Design a protein with these regions (language model features):
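Predominantly extracellular beta-rich ligand-binding scaffolds that present long acidic/polar faces
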Residues: 1-171
Length: 171
């Protein structure tokens, strides 16, 4: 609760090799972000996530594993690869799950992978509050991510990224 992260970045690899199927959240910046005053803004990640989700309560996101209780991701960017060796879990380029009442606006997902959605891995949650969520063309992800606002060319994504005013670097 009450966590504020601004102009933060992460570059690296996260490997999950859980064999028991217990609930957990994994994110490039934060595992679980919750509470109305919690915010990730103007942040970015370049991640490789290697997952083998055993159950749907295992969540992986390029920025946040689970976003809930009015916590928010805004003006942020994620790139990289997420490989889920199973068809289980909630795996998303930006967030694993947005349940319950997380907010996402003005994000770009330049994530490719196996058994991963571009934006949110929780495609069954109908009350998602996701706006201005973009993916970059040419990335291999699961089709029909209902939370993608539109698909951008790489040039369009670079222009939009400049507008996000992210000053942190990945170096």
């Amino acid at each position: 609760n009450n966590t504020q992260i601004t102009n933060s970045s992460f570059t690296g690899t996260i490997v999950s090799n859980d064999k028991q199927g217990k609930e957990y959240n994994v994110g490039g910046l934060v595992a679980n972000l919750k509470g109305g005053n919690s915010l990730i803004s103007q942040s970015r990640a370049d991640v490789t996530i290697l997952a083998g989700a055993r159950a749907n309560n295992q969540r992986f996101g390029g920025l946040v594993g689970r976003l809930e209780n009015n916590a928010r991701i805004s003006r942020s960017y994620v790139a990289g690869k997420i490989q889920n060796s199973t068809k289980n879990g909630q795996i998303g380029g930006v967030v694993g799950s947005n349940y319950f009442n997380g907010l996402i606006d003005n994000v770009i997902s330049n994530v490719s992978g196996t058994n991963v959605y571009s934006i949110s891995g929780d495609q069954g949650y109908e009350n998602n509050r996701i706006t201005e969520a973009y993916t970059v063309e040419g990335n291999t992800t699961l089709e029909n991510d209902k939370f993608v606002t539109s698909t951008l060319t790489l040039n369009q994504a670079e222009e939009k990224l400049a507008d996000l005013d992210i000053t942190t670097t990945l170096e």
